[in-house]
Amino acid sequence: MRLKESIIFIGVFSFIVGIFLSLIAVTSHNDPNQYVKIEVQSGDTLWGLADQVNDSKSIDKNAFIDWVTQHNDLASTEIQPGDILVIPVKKEHPFVYQLATVQ
């Protein structure tokens, strides 16, 4: 009976450790993006922001706009001065340092 309890304990323990390690692997993947908050200025558009961020053409402009719209809960693609937006940028991207309004 002790052997059966030991086997069950080892099995449950191994399962829990496996789930824990899987969660660590999933959450610690190397994301090439970072996210910054910016304050929209007069004359800014999502297309203009897409052009500034996407100088390397690493992401489609429409995909960028869709991402920003979805992750900022925007009802449309229109943005207003004073809006605070979270946008994805590549790590070490000069855009992050060029914006005077990075939050």
From Swiss-Prot:
Entries under InterPro entries matching the protein: Cell_div_suppressor_YneA, LysM_dom, LysM_dom_sf
Alphabetized Gene3D superfamilies for the sequence: LysM domain
Keyword Lipoprotein in record: no
PROSITE patterns: LYSM (PS51782)
Sorted UniProt keywords: Cell cycle, Cell division, Cytoplasm, DNA damage, DNA repair, Septation, SOS response
Keyword Transferase tagged: no
Similarity annotation: Belongs to the YneA family.
NCBIfam families according to UniProt: PRK14125.1
Cited function: Inhibits cell division during the SOS response. Affects a later stage of the cell division protein assembly, after the assembly of the Z ring, by probably suppressing recruitment of FtsL and/or DivIC to the division machinery.
UniProt-recorded name of the protein: Cell division suppressor protein YneA
Taxon lineage: Bacteria, Bacillati, Bacillota, Bacilli, Bacillales
